Regions:
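Electrostatic, structured charged patches in enzyme active sites and in nucleic-acid/phosphate-binding
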Residues: 1-122
């Protein structure tokens, strides 16, 4: 379901997310966003989410994966920027910061299992 033959190198959490997303029947395609080359959210910082997902219903989801060691102000700023983008982009667009299961996510973020549950319904 990737848009391209080969995607850029991914870390373990990104790869896990992509494998789970690919298995969902309501996912039309996904794309690995190349930092500093592809899409970014422009705001008080430039934020390059990891993955763009399109559902069969046409919703666009941006997902940023984070390990527990990255619970910091930079991640909080990205959550705020992603939420602002989703509000401005309209009802067909969503943004999620996704932490691996077993980690307590930052406010405004979700775990991998929670994200996949939400994605199944979009």
């Amino acid at each position: 379901k990737s848009l391209y033959q080969a995607e850029a190198n991914m870390d373990t959490l990104e790869r896990e997310l992509v494998m789970d997303v690919t298995a969902l029947p309501n996912v039309r395609w996904w794309h690995r966003i190349m930092e500093r080359h592809d899409f970014y959210i422009n705001g008080f910082i430039n934020h390059y989410p990891d993955i763009m997902i399109c559902t069969q219903s046409g919703k666009i989801i941006l997902a940023e994966t984070k390990g527990g060691h990255l619970k910091n102000d930079d991640s909080r700023q990205k959550i705020a920027l992603g939420a602002a983008w989703a509000r401005a982009a309209g009802t067909q667009c969503r943004y999620f910061m996704v932490f691996k299961d077993g980690e307590t996510p930052l406010d405004g973020a979700v775990t991998m299992s929670r994200f996949l549950g939400i994605l199944r319904e979009l």
